[in-house]
Regions:
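Conserved C-terminal helix/tail region of periplasmic/extracytoplasmic solute-binding proteins
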Residues: 73, 167, 400-453
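Short, solvent-exposed loop/beta-turn-alpha elements that line the ligand-binding surface or hinge
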Residues: 36-37, 122-133, 192, 199-201, ...
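Extracytoplasmic ligand-binding clamshell segments of periplasmic binding protein
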Residues: 197, 221-306
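Conserved N-terminal structural module of periplasmic/extracytoplasmic solute-binding proteins
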Residues: 4-10, 14, 22-111, 319, ...
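Hinge/lid segment of periplasmic solute-binding proteins
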Residues: 36-39, 106-157, 214, 317-325
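Extracytoplasmic/periplasmic solute-binding protein
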Residues: 148-152, 157, 181-232, 238-241, ...
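Mature extracytoplasmic/periplasmic domains
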Residues: 301-312, 338, 342-415
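A structural signal for short loop-to-beta-strand junctions that line the ligand-binding cleft
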Residues: 91, 98-100, 129-164, 199, ...
């Protein structure tokens, strides 16, 4: 998930949260049997949801079910991804202003769990799903074997192609990573429709979240823990193999700008589209400029022919034009991709921990997990993956998620992302004459950020 925060702000996270939270509290172990709806009529708790990924249908289910089961009121407040960390830093230490339950990006979780911002919910782990919960997300929310946040939902990345353009270029869907790299370079060279600045694979110059798949596929990583210290690994030999492939794609398959990130790549695979600002106002137009993009699974709702539904513009998927497939790895199995999604936890300063735990029970219930899947969000509990369906998007999502990875669980990882240093590094790869020297330069810049607490 996207998270941006000024570095100076993030370095104060630990001080602010530790001042109020100490080492992190333990949520009450009282069961739902102690909840008296009549006694809770005047009580309320607040849930922070990040961005708009949770559909209105699910929000209504949460508020209605919470009211029915507890008698209390659930207030849902949506927080933008751009300032979520800043708001968490300010609100979580303050018992008078803290939200009771918080959704955060899975890569943000380690920063806050390591400094006591969330209550210990280890006593609920088995009840909420136990080993069926997404392991990498559970790990991101754990400290010293204790659980502080758990998975909320998962989203996996896969490839969307203009099947018609691939066919016109005479290129088949690849079965290995090498075949994919060759295919998109060939399509760029063939450019069957003679489109200006055409990309066989649109990969933004600063798009590290998708590019990292090539690093993972070559057994590299962004960082690793050595003893008690985290170190950046951009210059490790295996990582450099992946970076060399990325550089080749930047130079020979993608005409994306060197400062383009991972936002809205579908604008370039649709026949026509609009560039919208934060308020939803159109600021420009795009036309077909790429044969392939990589994006989270929910992007398929933004891909297709333009149609009208209830007087509104919608995208209608067209199997004759579009297709989805999993990025293949070197061995033909799904390549490792960066998992998207969120974790969720109870604030250590919540004044209503029992009610907060009731909300967690509702979120991890079979009913809600199935609702997540039915709305295209990967359930936290693998038992409910069938709710995703069996169409090409569900199949790609499940296959892609089977080999997904998270960013390093370093306490300062949010500082790395917020500093935009990875965007800066990847933006220099295309024109780098010495990848190893560039990687070593940025290893030295990233190392101190990784260990911020």
């Amino acid at each position: 998930m996207k998270k941006y925060l000024g570095l100076a702000t993030l370095t104060t996270v630990a001080a602010l949260v530790l001042t109020a939270c100490g080492g992190g509290s333990t949520a009450s172990t009282d069961s739902s049997a102690t909840i008296d709806p009549a006694a809770n009529a005047d009580k309320s708790i607040t849930l922070w949801l990040a961005g708009g990924d949770t559909p209105d249908e699910l929000r209504t289910y949460l508020t209605d079910t919470f009211k029915d089961q507890t008698g209390a009121t659930l207030k849902i407040e949506e927080q933008g991804w751009g300032d979520l960390v800043t708001k968490m830093t300010t609100a979580l230490p303050d018992p008078n202003n803290t939200p009771d339950v918080v959704e955060m990006g899975n890569t943000q979780s380690p920063t806050f769990t390591n400094i006591g911002a969330f209550a210990d919910i280890s006593d609920m782990y088995e009840e909420l799903g136990g080993a069926k919960l997404i392991p990498s997300f559970v790990e991101a929310g754990a400290v010293d074997g204790k659980n502080f946040t758990l998975p909320y939902y998962a989203g996996s990345r896969y490839m969307f192609q203009r099947a018609d353009v691939w066919e016109e270029a005479g290129v088949d869907t690849p079965t290995t990573l090498e075949e994919f790299n060759t295919a998109v370079k060939t399509i760029t060279e063939e450019n069957p429709r003679d489109i200006k600045n055409f990309s066989g694979f649109f990969l933004g110059g600063q798009d590290w979240r998708n590019s990292v798949s090539w690093i993972f596929a070559n057994n590299g990583d962004l960082a690793k823990k050595e003893g008690d210290t985290w170190v950046s690994t951009l210059s490790d030999p295996d990582t450099l193999k992946g970076l060399a492939q990325i550089q080749d794609l930047y130079r020979n398959a993608s005409k994306a700008p060197s400062d383009a990130k991972d936002a809205t790549p579908w604008l370039y695979i649709n026949d026509t589209d609009q560039i919208l600002d934060d308020e939803g106002e159109a600021t420009g137009k795009t036309s077909l400029a790429a044969a392939t993009i990589m994006a989270p699974g929910w992007a398929h709702w933004s891909i297709g022919d333009l149609a009208k539904q209830d007087g509104k513009d919608v995208r209608e998927w067209n199997d004759e034009k579009f297709s989805a497939f999993v990025l293949p790895g070197n061995d033909g199995n799904p390549a490792p991709v960066l998992a998207g999604g969120s974790n969720i936890g109870i604030s250590a300063q919540s004044q209503n921990p029992d009610l907060a735990k009731e909300l967690m029970r509702i979120i991890f219930s079979a009913e809600y997990q199935n609702l997540l899947g039915e709305n295209g969000l990967g359930p936290a509990n693998a038992d409910y993956n069938a709710a995703l369906g069996d169409d090409q998007f569900a199949q790609a999502a499940i296959a892609s998620a089977s080999n997904s990875k998270l960013t390093p669980a370093a306490p300062g990882w949010a500082a790395v992302e917020s500093s935009m240093i990875l965007e800066e590094f990847f933006g220099k790869i295309r024109d780098a004459d010495d990848l190893k020297a560039l990687a070593e330069e940025y290893d030295a810049k990233i190392d101190p950020l990784l260990n911020l607490k």
